[in-house]
Structures are given as structure tokens and as C-alpha cells.
Regions:
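Catalytic beta-strand/loop cores that center a nucleophilic Ser/Cys/Thr
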Residues: 317-392, 475, 482-486
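Short solvent-exposed loop/turn micro-motifs enriched in small/polar/acidic residues
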Residues: 15-18, 304, 370-371, 380-381
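Cysteine-nucleophile active-site neighborhood
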Residues: 245, 250, 254-335, 407-417, ...
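Short linear motifs in low-complexity or flexible loops
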Residues: 501-509, 518, 525-526, 530, ...
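Residue-level detector of beta-strand face positions
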Residues: 23-24, 62, 310-312, 387
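Active-site-proximal beta-strand elements of phosphoester/diester hydrolases
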Residues: 208-212, 322-323, 396-400
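Proline-centered loop/turn at the N-terminus of a beta-strand
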Residues: 125, 208, 278-280, 296, ...
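RNA-binding accessory domains that recognize and position tRNA/RNA substrates
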Residues: 2-229, 233-241, 246, 260, ...
Length: 558
């Protein structure tokens, strides 16, 4: 009798409710059927897929998925439940979720509730039992497209008519729907207690940073704080004049959803900020910087979404495994014509940017608005642009997610690079000493020496922007000096853990290796940096790579 009762309880705990039919219909007529495992309803969005093996809660709560129906390629989702510490926002922004098998009985000590319960609580329509392998292959071959997911109407003809009448993703300003409504501050006191084992922030913030919220993930803001930034997060369309009035040491542009062409309220302000203050962009922020520079943006066939995308850093030759989530990408040739003397002698652009990875060259273009821009990162799967760095103003950006969540942390060094960039850029009004007093960072000797003044044309007040102090940069100013960071060393030597933070936080910037000038370094590090700067003045050919020769070198014929 006792065994029978135990068996019944186990059965009750592992059984799923009676299945309700659900249907997913794509605009090209493809139909995939399954059973409901979330809230009831009918939703429309762009179908996409994510290849992450774990981190489903981070994916579901990522604001960048606004307007989309996500298909998870891993066969079982929900087996470790849901906990609020891992969520990237207060609530999911996605339209719907498609999985092969939904686990209703999670097993993990951190689990607060099951994923099906979480989805129902937040009115997220979800379906299981779908042949996700067939669905992903279809999206891969036919491209991302409009879709409808319904648990209330499963008639194929009816759903097909509805989805073809729905609004496409292109042209929608979804960033405005997930941005904050008013500015707020984020500091060390806002870090979650459950992450006490993680990287500890310095005792005193080194930099004041204004972050544009176009759908920012919590983990990005937390990583900025842990790297020594005191944040003021502002809405997506905050005027540049208001940002400059805060006198920040740097500006961060966050990730976000949807079509970057529709987020003019952000990139029009970024155009006024470039050249006035150091700028770092991630994902949509990368696209905002590109748009500000006049670049073209293309819609990818099915996007990059997952935690296993290989990207080569063209400055170092290292390959990083990255987390990505985007459906649009920068058209690098649209930034300007190549500068042959800084591009291995090549005069013509390549459609497949893996050409530069094979040649070991980080090409430079001459941008009409902001001068020279170097391609720094390339996707090794499809040859698309993954990162750029400006050579004449302090700004850089990447298309992927260095904070991961979920995914690998190979690119975490970029948060350190942002700190080094802010350390190296000094405001002319008041000089290096006043700038150091503002930021709490000792001035770099090389920054106080020879300088190249960089003044944006917008600083004079064009387009309604107020006059702003120009930036002076160490001469020569090279992106390699702050982007060439050893990944392993950054994970260990550059960071403090737990109680160590209080002791190490008081160390000087020089001791922690955040200064961008060669005079702030010692021994082999200074020699290495000098070598990097010398290399930047010559065609970029990395050791161990094929020489810069080919069918199109120096204007050669195909």
C-alpha cells in the first residue's frame, strides 16, 4: 500500500497535463504541429533558432528576442528549472517558444519553478513535440520569415492567411519597446548577492559611463560594473547633449532587438557623440556605431544565435568562441574605400571577409565622416564583420556578446579594453591631470606627451548639438594598444575575486594593467606594445599566417 502511494505521487510529479494541440505555420506555407506547453493564445513573429545547449532562461529573457519566435535546437529544455538570478530582464520579451521536449519536473538546487509554469506566468505561448531538426533545416535553407504560433486555432489555411497579413520584422523599432522609460543608476551595490563567487568590482569605480538602453541585458551592465564602471542607464533616444552634460568618461551602446535602420533615435545621437567621448558598442550598439558612420546594414538569411560561433581577432590571430544573437549585420565595404598602405597593399574589397583572416591582415577603410576604421573581428562561419575599431577617434564595437550569458567567456577582455580606451582618451579642457581627477585614474605619461587632436565636425554645434570639448589621444593612436589583451591573463591577473577585491582595488591603474600608453608598461609588455604600434604603421601580416599576396593585392588582376 505504501509503495503504491509512493508510485502514485511519483507519477503525479512526472506526468504532464492532457495535451492541447498547437500549430506553427510559416509564411511560405510550412506547417509544424505539436502540443501546447506554455500559455494559451496566438502570437506572430519572426521564426528563428538558437543553438545553445544550456542557458534557456537567459535566452528567453533576453530583450533582443522581442518580436521573435525562438526554436531551441537542443532536444530537451527546462530540465534545471528557472531561477530569477539568471534572468536578463524582469520578463520575457519573445513572442513564442518552440521545443522538441519540455521538462515539467526540473532537478536543480537553484530552481525556483518549472519552465512551463514560468511561461504560463508570463503569458508566453509555447509548443513542444515539434520536429525541431526539420524546422531548423527549413529556416536554414529558406531563411527567417514571419510565423504564427497558435494553441487556439490550428487550422492550416486560417493560420496561413493570418501570418501573411501580419507585420514583418523589418522596419519595426522594437528597441523602443524594451528600453527603460527613464534614466537610472547601476553600481556595485546593485550586483546580485548570488554572484559573490564571481569577479568582484573595485572598491571605487574608475570610470563614469552612460549606457544607452536599447534592450540591455542585465549581465552586460553587471560586467561593466565589475570592470570598474559606474553606470547611468538612459533611454534609447536620449539626446547627445544630455549625455555630454553628464560629463561621462565613456558611452556604452547596448544590445537590442529588431531592425537597426528603424532605431534612428539612437544612431542619430551616436553620430554626435563619436569624437567627443570614448564609445563602446555591443550587438545592436555595434550597428548603431556603423549607422552613425554611414554604413549599410544587411539582413542575414537566418541570423547568428547561439553560443558556439567562431570569430577571429585579426589584430592577434586568436580565435574566440562567442555567444551571438542578431539577424542583421554590418556591410564592411560600405564604410569606405580601403587604405592600401594599411591593408597589406590591397585596393579592392572582398565580399567574404574570411579572406582577411586567411591573409592575416586587419584592413583599414577611409570613412568620410570619422576617418580611418579598422576591421578587427571576422566570423569564421560565414565571413561577416564582427568588430571594428576607429583609428582617429576613441571608439570600437563588436557584433557578438562578450558577456555571453549564456555562452563562453573568450571575449570578456573587451570590457577591459573599454577601460583602457577610457584611460587613454584625455579631455583637452583642463588637461590630463583634471581628466584623471574626474575619472580617478592616474594620467598616462604617454598621453600627456605628443598628442593628435581629434575634433568631430559636430562639436561646433551642427544639427543642434552643443559645442563639446575635443578629445586628444596618445600619438600614435592605435587600436592594437587597447584591444590586444591576452584572454587567459585577463581572466586571472586582471580580476579580483571575493574578499581579494578590497585589497587589490586600491592598487594603481598601472599595477592593474589598465593604462593604454606604452610608458605605463614595463619590460616585455612595453616592448610588445611598441612592436604592435610599429606593426600598425605597416601592412598587418601576422606571424604564422600566409603572406599578403593574392589575386587582388596591390590592384592585381583576378
Amino acid at each position: 500500500m505504501i509503495l503504491s502511494e509512493i508510485a502514485n505521487k511519483l507519477l503525479e510529479g512526472t506526468s504532464k497535463p492532457a495535451p492541447r494541440p498547437a500549430a506553427l505555420v510559416l509564411e511560405d506555407g510550412a506547417v509544424f504541429r505539436g502540443t501546447a506547453c506554455g500559455a494559451s493564445g496566438e502570437v506572430y513573429g519572426e521564426i528563428c533558432f538558437n543553438t545553445s545547449l544550456e542557458g534557456y532562461l537567459e535566452v528567453i529573457t533576453d530583450p533582443s528576442y522581442a518580436g521573435q519566435i525562438i526554436t531551441m535546437t537542443y532536444p530537451q529544455i527546462g530540465n534545471y528549472g528557472v531561477n530569477p538570478e539568471d534572468a536578463q530582464a524582469d520578463a520575457p520579451a519573445l513572442r513564442g517558444l518552440v521545443v522538441r521536449d519540455m521538462c515539467a519536473t526540473p532537478s536543480n538546487w537553484r530552481s525556483a519553478q518549472s519552465l512551463p509554469d514560468y511561461l504560463r506566468e508570463h503569458d508566453v505561448v509555447a509548443v513542444e513535440g515539434v520536429d525541431t531538426r526539420a524546422l531548423v533545416r527549413h529556416v536554414r535553407d529558406c531563411g527567417a520569415q514571419r510565423a504564427v504560433l497558435s494553441t487556439v486555432d490550428v487550422d492550416e489555411a486560417s493560420l496561413l492567411a493570418k501570418v501573411r497579413a501580419s507585420e514583418p520584422l523589418v522596419g519595426q523599432n522594437l528597441a523602443a519597446t524594451v528600453s527603460c522609460e527613464k534614466a537610472y543608476a547601476v553600481g556595485a551595490g546593485d550586483l546580485p548577492a548570488s554572484h559573490a563567487f564571481a569577479v568582484a568590482p573595485p572598491a571605487t569605480a574608475r570610470h563614469r559611463v552612460v549606457a544607452y538602453d536599447c534592450g540591455a541585458k542585465r549581465s552586460i551592465l553587471q560586467n561593466l560594473v565589475r570592470s570598474g564602471c559606474e553606470l547611468t542607464v538612459v533611454p534609447w533616444d536620449t539626446p547627445a547633449a544630455d549625455v555630454l552634460a553628464m560629463a561621462p568618461d565613456g558611452v556604452f551602446l547596448s544590445n537590442g532587438p529588431g531592425d537597426p535602420e528603424a532605431v534612428e533615435g539612437t544612431y542619430s545621437q551616436v553620430e554626435k557623440l563619436l569624437g567627443q567621448v570614448p564609445v563602446f558598442g555591443i550587438c545592436l550598439g555595434h550597428q548603431m556605431i556603423a549607422k552613425a558612420a554611414g554604413a549599410g546594414i544587411e539582413k542575414l538569411k537566418f541570423g547568428h544565435r547561439g553560443g558556439n560561433h567562431p570569430v577571429m581577432n585579426l589584430l592577434t590571430g586568436r580565435v574566440e568562441i562567442t555567444a551571438q544573437n542578431h539577424g542583421f549585420g554590418l556591410v564592411f565595404p560600405s564604410l569606405g574605400e580601403l587604405v592600401p598602405e594599411l591593408s597589406g597593399g590591397f585596393k579592392g574589397h572582398e565580399d567574404d571577409l574570411r579572406f582577411w583572416a586567411r591573409a592575416g591582415i586587419a584592413p583599414v577603410v577611409d570613412n568620410p565622416r570619422f576617418g580611418r576604421i579598422r576591421l578587427t573581428h571576422v566570423n569564421l562561419n560565414d565571413g561577416t564583420a564582427e568588430g571594428v575599431a576607429f583609428l582617429d577617434i576613441p571608439a570600437f564595437s563588436v557584433q557578438y556578446h562578450p558577456e555571453a550569458s549564456p555562452g563562453p567567456t573568450d571575449a570578456h577582455y573587451l570590457f577591459t579594453a573599454f577601460g583602457r580606451l577610457m584611460d587613454s582618451a584625455v579631455l583637452t579642457n583642463g588637461g590630463a591631470a583634471d581628466a584623471a581627477a574626474t575619472s580617478g585614474t592616474p594620467p598616462c605619461p604617454s598621453a600627456a606627451a605628443g598628442r593628435t587632436e581629434v575634433q568631430s565636425s559636430l562639436a561646433s554645434g551642427q544639427s543642434g548639438a552643443p559645442a563639446a570639448p575635443s578629445l586628444t589621444l596618445p600619438d600614435p593612436w592605435e587600436c592594437a594598444s587597447y584591444l590586444d589583451i591576452d584572454i587567459a591573463a585577463d581572466r586571472l591577473a586582471g580580476w579580483t575575486f571575493g574578499e581579494q577585491a578590497a585589497t587589490v582595488a586600491g592598487a594603481s591603474t598601472k599595477e592593474q594593467g589598465f593604462c593604454g600608453g606604452a610608458d605605463c608598461l614595463e619590460g616585455s609588455a612595453a616592448d610588445e606594445l611598441s612592436g604592435l604600434r610599429a606593426a600598425c604603421e605597416q601592412p598587418q601580416v601576422l606571424k604564422g599566417k600566409m603572406p599578403a599576396t593574392g589575386s587582388r593585392q596591390a590592384g592585381g588582376e583576378d
